[in-house]
Amino acid sequence: MCIFERINNEYQRILNIEFKNKNTKRESIEKDIQKLVSEKVDGVFIHLLENTNQRTFSNERETGIFDKLYKSFFDFQTKWNDEHKSIRLIIISLKQKILIYRVLKKNDFENLKDVFFIENHCGSIEEIKGNGWETQTTK
């Protein structure tokens, strides 16, 4: 999805949005991250989950959402165009009624493992605290 702004009778793209649901395949996430990183405008990556458990975000088999996001951003970091551009990451757990979000900028690639808790193996959405991640609980 793209958001446009009308300026002097012309439409200019100002935001790209990509959506995922469930714990989808890494290739599917990679495709969306490559698009967001390569574009000149800001982006948003929204991932909707039914629920999370101890292996949802990071695990030894590297099949968690953070594992896949880390690998995708690592692989495409050289494609990032603009120092001022940002990508907002939003992950929502419906059953737990929790939303986590973070803004990622080019300088975050220096600490990408920390951003995605790669060495800590965070599993459930309730475990995601710090490293720039914010939490919001819905009722």
What role is predicted for each listed range?
Residues E5-E10, Q77-W80:
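Alpha-helix termini
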